[in-house]
């Protein structure tokens, strides 16, 4: 193989030609940001989802399924209507739109992460940046919401969106899920499904899609109890980390154990480190090489509006560099608190103490004798507002009265003398809290592509094949008669049917020479070819050919299912 071999271009051709994946709507010219999975690709995708699902279930997480279409008020509460936006410029000549930050970084080499629309507009003007399609003048930068908008039913007032993440379907069901978990923290809930983001100018093939599959888990926990109960089981596992400080100083990654990651303060607690290890193990189980995996901490300006800290599990691509495949976001109580406020639902959990506690509380009420004549009918309303305040709000009210001498409620200016403030002691057996959330969020499409890219192998003799993890292969076994003649074909077909019944993904193929057939199945990653040759009718044995080594062993036909299970699944 010469030095001009382009792995990306070869892989794109292979995916289209052999039934892995290709751009959607081809006969109508295609549409960027959409991909179809062919028979082989759909099988691998299903296996990736299964690996993630099995890992989540082993952790004791509950699986649910919720709608893709979501009413607008859910995303108003979650902040997506206001904040799920990207900066855009439009060509005044041809009308094409582009991500402003990507355009500036690609053509000017200027990092504009965290810059405002006004600042990016100024950079475009000062450097004379033009439309890359036609050379026309670009507009000022404006923001574009990435959610696909729709309506529920025929009424325009029933606005809805295709969900940009699966997470909100879990949060709005928290009350029922908490009851299912018997009000005991921590617990995890996950779902696997489609998400949609109306990307402005998606490029990079399957790396940036408008419709994609996610596997997201929301782990609800008490923020006062951040030690994972099973951390000792994983504390010696190695993690390659790229924290913010190292990024800013260009120091590169550090490799530490999960325990060291917590002790050195790279991650905030053992909950974080535990799920980093879980994510790494899932990626390894899918077949991503360990040396191609790292965890990069997002810079503050990169984080989503709901995140207090996020680490991305990235996988290295020869074509695209480090690619985010899994996010691990600390969402705090952001989502549940917002949905409580918007919906009025109680999304708290009662935490019971081992022993009752005596606590001091502030009680505040209106001095009705003093303010009654002034407030008249509104006095009762204002008193109810005060009663609805929690301790933090009452403490702030008292602090404002002490410092400023007055506060304003419902348009009425009230002085310190208008209130009765008492400090009382109460014996309590527990407290209500809003749980915090840690979210491992897997994309499925990116790991799919990166698994194929990292599996594509070129031997010294020029053989090109997918060295995919054996249990991830889309076809696990190919049964091949040496030549298309009796009795070899009948014996081979009977073996094929037996392996089907044993649960293997298996094909029967008698077309072309045996060498061409070996190449055909090597190329798509089939780990083993079973060959029925002239010796088979004599002694009831067949050969099993290994994809990677090309070595062959002979086994009895009756031993074939057991041997293949051992070779493929261990």
Swiss-Prot record:
GO terms for cellular component: cytoplasm. Keywords: Aminoacyl-tRNA synthetase, ATP-binding, Cytoplasm, Ligase, Nucleotide-binding, Protein biosynthesis. GO terms for biological process: glycyl-tRNA aminoacylation. It catalyses: tRNA(Gly) + glycine + ATP = glycyl-tRNA(Gly) + AMP + diphosphate. One of its GO terms (molecular function) is protein dimerization activity. It is an enzyme of class 6 (ligase). Pfam families: HGTP_anticodon (PF03129), tRNA-synt_2b (PF00587). CDD domains: GlyRS-like_core, GlyRS_anticodon. Its EC number is 6.1.1.14. It is found in: Cytoplasm. Catalyzes the attachment of glycine to tRNA(Gly). Belongs to the class-II aminoacyl-tRNA synthetase family. This is Glycine--tRNA ligase. The lineage of its organism: Archaea, Methanobacteriati, Methanobacteriota, Thermococci, Thermococcales. The gene is glyS.
